[in-house]
From Swiss-Prot:
Name this polypeptide is given: UPF0178 protein Sama_3557
NCBIfam families listed in its UniProt record: PRK00124.1 (NF001095)
Annotated family: Belongs to the UPF0178 family.
InterPro entries for the chain: UPF0178
Pfam families named in the record: DUF188 (PF02639)
Highest taxon of the lineage: Bacteria
Length: 149
């Protein structure tokens, strides 16, 4: 059982939470990115560098993830794919994607993308807040608590 991280867009503060959890629970955290990612020396923290390209890191995560594992991503299409494989997906703001809610999130993402492309809506999400960080840590702790000791 391990945690996979879509590391290219994962905020540093969230990575730090994951690194502490990896050490505390002795669970493997693997960061997947198309650029070098600095990780602390630990037998529980790994990184995989993939080639640059559209969805290359996402495809690597989908290929490697197993049922019941956790994927950290803000990428809703990636969340949809890993959920289809029986994994769980958690975004850096603490929202747990499930089979019940991921399709609605995907539809909303596509709608917002259309609005941005037409010039009606601009900008992206607000910066990560302290409440977001706490919500992420709480969801991560809930997932970790379900693991066998």
């Amino acid at each position: 059982m391990q945690i996979w991280v879509d590391a290219d867009a994962c905020p540093s503060v969230i990575k730090e939470v994951l690194f502490r959890a990896a050490e505390r629970r002795q669970i493997t955290v693997t960061l997947v990115a198309n650029q070098s990612v600095r990780v602390p020396p630990s037998p529980f923290i790994k990184s995989i560098r993939v080639e640059s390209g559209f969805d290359v890191a996402d495809n690597e995560i989908v290929k490697r993830v197993s049922k019941g594992e956790l994927v950290i991503t803000a990428d809703i299409p990636l969340a949809d794919e890993v959920i289809a494989k029986g994994a769980l997906a958690l975004n850096p703001r603490g929202e747990l994607y499930t089979a019940e809610n991921v399709k609605a999130r995907l539809n909303m993402r596509d709608f917002m993308e259309t609005l941005r492309a037409s010039g009606i809506q601009s900008g992206g999400p607000a910066p990560l807040s302290q409440a977001d960080r706490q919500a992420f840590a709480n969801q991560l702790d809930r997932w970790l608590a379900r693991l066998p000791k």
